[in-house]
């Protein structure tokens, strides 16, 4: 039997140094930690970690190699009222494991107990941590380092984007390899996007409730092991092969000049509430990892049963180590943080929260793009506009106001102008720049763009909750017919609204984020919460792509790059050459016009580009300002000879002109 020596208290997790493996595990309240190793037949051998430095338990196993499967059993007090739920009958995943073998199938042995510890051994039902080999040939890979002002984000799901792509070999569809395939690279370049933002690719599992309904967690916001690659998206599902396949995709995307941003769920874990399974953190040090109420229950500020305590020094270290792994070992270019108010809780939200300060101090993390979803469901959870530099934020005000203007006729141009100007009322503070405003009209969470113009209500019956889940208010408009059908007049109106929303997104100051599939006309048939639909409802049907809409979207992105006012990282000032606001007569907007109910606006950008908006329900005449103006693609041909002085704007229409 091999013997462990003391080893070292860092780095976190299991690290192969060429001669053996160093194991570390944080637990402030444990009394004993056993390292459990598994051979090819599943036989378990246990070793007590021989050393403790502060609250880190550690040991070194000479001769151990990558591919070794392991877990932990952690001994300590069972005192639920104090937040302690140690149960050595439960094999636990290493929170810092960079590989996990096996998937979670709901099994009663996975539950640690509520009032008393469950004595059943979960070994045969529990996925295993895997020692990984971090050596990888990155060749001459370098980050594209796209300036924020030039950034156009494309939010996508690994499987949904590529599962039905006809030009990708069947064995690679729905995988990391597909992302780096020449067919996908060509698609990204055709659109002109600069950053691929991927929904979670860290190891996750399906909630027990979904499994019992015969459904699966598709989106991935139920994290099991945040440092480990999700193997279900790999063409070769062994953890090491999956990790290297992901790295291959990143390398290929970088060669094409495309950044990779990962959606990360640093707010809760798959252990859910007190009735949920015990996989890792609950059994390792429940009181340290989670926000615990006075009675020992969890603060549920995420809506998922538990909330990570990211003000605890050890949990901050855990989060920082996780992010650094993805940047330094996988070369990702940034992160989008789900329910990110949790990251700043102390428990009150603070701009100088420990995790934020640690991220700003870290050389690797301060050099990548950091984007937050600036809310959670806890007290004071809505924090839009309140994040410190260098964070950018999803701007739900842009999403809602643009939908309300174009689809519901509920706003006038004053509010629209504010959103076009990078929502300066929200973000122009604390030294932040316009790129901190991430504009979106749709995201994975909610209606697709096509569904926004095709459905008044959500249709989530397939989710198994009798349509109770998902947002009730979507600021959508079916244009007179509920569903994808309808006559030609309905389709024409929908097309106009779609074009207007895309133009608003891509021709506004700030960082635009396009939901993958919106450029194709992808529909989820009214499901605005398709988190559990891993099927044709969410997979893109490339054979049905709306080529006209694809061309329109790509042309808007090309147009955006030509307009300095949209790509410069400085706030607009009246008459500074960046922007002038004009009325339908081509004259400067008067103060009383902004909120007078008018729904027409002209925006002169960089003294040469004129964006005209007609939010009325009928064709309206808009007089262009003095000069020779020609409409530009996608609103006219490349060599448009027609000089216009008046634009007869169609209902809910947009056009862009260039001054000769």
Curated annotation (Swiss-Prot):
The active site is at residues 338, 373. GO terms for biological process: glycogen catabolic process. Transmembrane segments: none annotated. The record marks 445 as: Transition state stabilizer. Keywords: Carbohydrate metabolism, Glycogen metabolism, Glycosidase, Hydrolase. Residues 460-482 are annotated as: Disordered. SUPFAM superfamilies: (Trans)glycosidases, E set domains, Glycosyl hydrolase domain. Pathway: Glycan degradation; glycogen degradation. GO terms for molecular function: glycogen debranching enzyme activity; hydrolase activity, hydrolyzing O-glycosyl compounds. This is Glycogen debranching enzyme. The lineage of its organism: Bacteria, Pseudomonadati, Pseudomonadota, Gammaproteobacteria, Enterobacterales. The gene is glgX.
